[in-house]
Amino acid sequence: NKLEIVIITVIDTWGSSPRPIGSSMIVNSRNDIVGSVSGGCIENFVFAKSLDIIKSGKYNVLEFGVTNSQAWEVGLTCGGKIKVLLEKFSYTDLKTIKKINKVFNDEGKLIILTDLSNGKREIIESKPINNNFFSKMFANETSKINIFNNTNWFCKVFSSQYKLIIIGAVHISESLVKLANILNFKVFLIDPRNNFNKSNFK
């Protein structure tokens, strides 16, 4: 639909923070919101900034902490600090978005590197890869800021959806499936008994 989106990602934290590094929130040009970066503390503020970025096309890095007057205004009172990256993606970035979607729904991993000085992006795919540094990142699935050639890059690891295999279509499984779906697991329910309440597991 040629919607433009802004992905807001936690790229660094200090002390107590509501969401870990790599947590993301997405805002599109229809004002839809998915995800969170602080559990409600700064979402309204970064939402407004995202709408500005959709218009301007510029990336932005914002920092919030209790010593920042702006942080009190938006409600970040947990005692720590967070830094977030706001990046615009449009239909011209469809190839990148399709790669992320394929990794999430299938298998494999990839890393998107963002140059924090200018917003430039590069993609590192997991196979084949001969770089020991990125191999460790893929193995640990740890997103973080790294320095390459005296430049700060945020390295975001994308991996497939976590899977939960449940053996037995019993009443406890029904509640477990609902909980797993809320937590965004890909659920596989296995039971060879065909008459065990298929209608309850849609």
What are these regions (language model features)?
Residues 1-201:
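Segments forming oxygen-rich coordination pockets for charged ligands
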